[in-house]
Amino acid sequence: MARLKPLSGFPEFLPSGQMVENHVTRILEETFELHGFAPIRTRAVEPMEQLTRKGEIDKEVYVVDRLHADPHDTRSGKDRLGLHFDLTVPFARYVLENAGHLYFPFRRYQIQKVWRGERPQEGRYREFTQADIDIVGDQTLAEHHDVETPLVMLSALERLHTELGFPTVTMHVNNRKLSEGFYRGLGIADPMAVLQRVDKYDKIGPDAVRKLLVDELNLSDDAAAKCVALASIQSTDDSFIAKVRELGVANDMLEEGLDSLNRVVAAVNKAVPGRMVANLKIARGLDYYTGTVYETELTGHESMGSVCSGGRYESLASDGKHVYPGVGISLGLTRLLAPILSRGELSSSRSVPSAVLVAVNTEEDRATSEVIASALRSRGIPCEVAPKADKFGKQIKHADRRGIPFVWFPGVKHADYRDADTVKDIRSGDQVEADAGAWNPPTEDLHPGVIGTW
């Protein structure tokens, strides 16, 4: 058989890495549920008509079809199915289909795989897991949710920092109305074209962006310079407002965006000082978000790009009679974890869940070991029974190779009694008598821990 090669862009973790992901997922789920977000799971496929509404994603959609499809199938392209490339499209459909059974504002979290047929590279995958939170209203959605949503995600990321040693994060925020109003105030008829060039600011620099605006969009030197100047503005307080006004552009939409952005930044930084930065060069997503837009970077690992982004949709979903506005944030879980795990910067303290290996005296006495294991499991202690009744030295070596910290030795059976059981910490060599109905491992050994080497 030919040697198997891994498929690029479809990351798979060894058990120790998967346990790290599971641990991170539990933290996210606990945090989201503490804030009242309900879990949902949507199907993997959606009609192509829905998936291709975002034109720029067309080439990245995986189409689903049967290998031996009916050659006479006359379905049009819109009736074909594809794998979802994010969780927003299926969520919008879910809201429309279940609106009569949901109570609004509806708060949901969703941790699920998505698929994109893009060229694999570090930080970009063809199959990956996202963790999304959204709050959706019926007809209206109060602005305070633009504050609440990032605070919930920041709370989850702070737990990853304090409990697992993840770097701290900074959330950058802009507002679609601010940027669009500024460009319209300059007399620019196509603000989206400007946003597409400004989106390259970090990659090519301000001078190159200015040149693109002049050469490709025929902006005047003065207008191009002001667009670049706007993109350079950042602050954690309201000083960004004065800096924008110094550029001398007047527009009602601009003022609305400034006020809204200021309220969001002030409220978030009051709760978690310094975690949110008004960053007016954020352009990605402003072509479909209608208000606030977020991007999040790991401190000291900015080269990874945004690991968490989102924003407000004034029309997340609509059935013609009802409009459902929403605000949400998506954490790229695989994008966050895969590079870290591959570099060994985060790992599990052991590669198996078991805290105890129950040794087997003889194969004839295996039932005794199984009874002990059942007693331990009934009290929430993960354990497994040795696969063979080898010499105890070999059974200890088996536990050591699997990273299991304790070995349980059943007492030897005699004609009318059985010796006391003992349990050994194979790291220290300490061995004590123990009762499976009462003994507990140290709390830190009960479940695998996560070790960071950042």
Swiss-Prot record:
PROSITE patterns reported in the protein's UniProt record: AA_TRNA_LIGASE_II
CDD domains (alphabetical): HisRS-like_core
Reaction catalysis annotation: tRNA(His) + L-histidine + ATP = L-histidyl-tRNA(His) + AMP + diphosphate + H(+)
InterPro entries reported for this sequence: aa-tRNA-synth_II, aa-tRNA-synth_II/BPL/LPL, Anticodon-bd, Anticodon-bd_dom_sf, His-tRNA-ligase, HisRS-like_core, HisRS/HisZ
Xref: Gene3D superfamilies: Anticodon-binding domain (3.40.50.800), Bira Bifunctional Protein, Domain 2 (3.30.930.10)
UniProt superkingdom: Bacteria
Protein family (similarity comment): Belongs to the class-II aminoacyl-tRNA synthetase family.
PANTHER family in the record: HISTIDINE--TRNA LIGASE (PTHR11476:SF7), HISTIDYL-TRNA SYNTHETASE (PTHR11476)
Protein name as annotated: Histidine--tRNA ligase
Species per Swiss-Prot/TrEMBL record: Cutibacterium acnes (strain DSM 16379 / KPA171202)
Gene designation per UniProt: hisS
